[in-house]
């Protein structure tokens, strides 16, 4: 129940008002159920997008811009969520996206199912603390099961890595080009992967995705270097430079205006001419300084004015201006250049190296390609597509594919998809629960039912009877050798998903279960919600009082 004020009565019977007027408070079972309802509502929205046969959502923002996607992270990001419990779910789901790169929908749907099962236990008067403890115990056991059945994968298992990427891409808008995109994703990740001790490390920041609509998805290609969505600044500059020695600048090549206001008294045309000549000399000296280091390519984060462009062109130097800071840093990492903030400090050893810097036409636009860099651990995927929204969705899909391949290489453990892991985990949890004392047993069983809801959602979204599929799954997993049996979403039959090549990183599964259990436990521990009056309402009331 929601009330405006909650008086507290001392033993002598004097009411004490502790909350500011206008503050709303809900507490007890009603507060808990309201929070559960909010999380389940978000989960229900994402549930129909789950799996390769899931539907898409059309999201329209306040400006009327339309996004069509089934990417869980994007849907949550675009939704204007108001309820505090729902906001918690969104925040934890974003953490899943940051940590594993995929599995956002699994996290949200599983959290919703955990709270749905918890609500049933609350109805039979099981305390929230017991439910939370039971869920923690079930999560510990589930994690053990997943880690014990996971199979090894290595940097050299290229075919398995491609299957992992294809599994991620199956549910995306780019599914028709999944084979091609899977190859690109694996090649890109393997290129930037670094061996550190006995483990592999992948920094996805070394993989740049540049979007350019036009052409088809299959026109997308991998560039072993950096691509700048810029063009060479002057028509007389070279368009192709081999054995490029690159100067990276964080300073403008133009006459800067003084920070204080100055007035110059000019009495003759000769003085104007002298002023312009002085400015030219300053710029010419800067260009001479750059050329003296041996640089034949200049890339700056700031501007290059017309006079500086002219002098650079005369020296045969290719120049690009107003490049994003993030791109400048990528070029620095790739070429070994040092970013210079003052041309007076520029030295030959500050220059980066690349085999080729070239301006090329891509669709209707020109772009600058930097290839054969000193450090090959930087690559660019030039993403093409027939229209802008398709390219945007392809970028989101490709990001997920890159993430799961990186997870697999770094962790070296993978599992089968199609609900196989969930069915195996649920089977073990039911057996484990029967050995537990007291009400904890009921909470562990509830966790198992929530896990089983995931393959049921896959089946439902593919048009199959979820109950029938669940019964078949349970029957198949009675045999230990059938641990990788899951749902064939085309036929509804239970098949060996490992032999079908439906593979996922262990990290995605583990992190999704952990994140969902964490948010469900947080929600179940809340028994009081105190909402301060909104600032806008207070201002409105003050204005109304002043008018009176």
From Swiss-Prot:
Belongs to the TCP-1 chaperonin family. InterPro entries: Chaperone_TCP-1, Chaperonin_TCP-1_CS, Cpn60/GroEL/TCP-1, GroEL-like_apical_dom_sf, GROEL-like_equatorial_sf, TCP-1-like_intermed_sf, TCP-1_chaperonin, thermosome_alpha. It comes from Aeropyrum pernix (strain ATCC 700893 / DSM 11879 / JCM 9820 / NBRC 100138 / K1). The keyword Chaperone applies. This is Thermosome subunit beta. Keywords: ATP-binding, Chaperone, Nucleotide-binding. CDD domains: cpn60. Molecular chaperone; binds unfolded polypeptides in vitro, and has a weak ATPase activity. One of its GO terms (molecular function) is ATP hydrolysis activity. Pfam families: Cpn60_TCP1. Forms a Heterooligomeric complex of two stacked eight-membered rings.
